[in-house]
Amino acid sequence: MRVGVISDTHNPSVGVEPPAEIIPAFEGVDVIIHAGDIYQPSCLDWLEKIAPVYAVELGAGAHFQGDPRVVDMSRVLELEGHTIGLIHDLMVPGMAQEGTEYTPLAKHFPTGANLSSALETIFHDAVDIVIFGHTHYPVVEEFQGILMVNPGSPSLPKQIRRLGQVAVMELEPDRKSAKILDLSMFN
């Protein structure tokens, strides 16, 4: 299964629609996961022309009342035998600060910390993949057997208004991988 991963689109603040380069970047994806800061349902409508969408949004009730694609705060998805925890702002108990592309996630946890247990506190389930956003910094890292993916932002990478990134995950029952795609490769 091929999964498009996106976060922090901030539409319409940075444009009426997400960047058009997302279309070729997500070519052939079976589903799209959005890790929040969506702002408007029209963004998900636009993405849903590519593939079905699952999303989280802080305060989802404001603009997404009754929208089955979006839940507030966090959710757990089962895809291809993997349990995926989806959250916008990943602050795990014991975590020193938010993860950025410049520091391995291991540096954010105390020595001997059990990431799996900490994540179970957040998601109320054991997960083997975590998708998060908020930082606008792309991260793909496996830590303590858990694949951690932050796709960055397609429209505000590192809080700078320019073309940014998304991620694509490849899932099989016994395999998981993800890579960051720089959208400038598609224009």
Identify the role of each PLM range.
Residues R2-T83:
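Core catalytic region of metal-dependent phosphoesterases/phosphodiesterases
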Residues M1, D67, E172-K176:
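Non-catalytic terminal accessory segments
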Residues K179-N187:
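Short, solvent-exposed aromatic-acidic interface loops
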Residues I33, T83-H88, L147-N150:
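Short hydrophobic-aromatic micro-motifs
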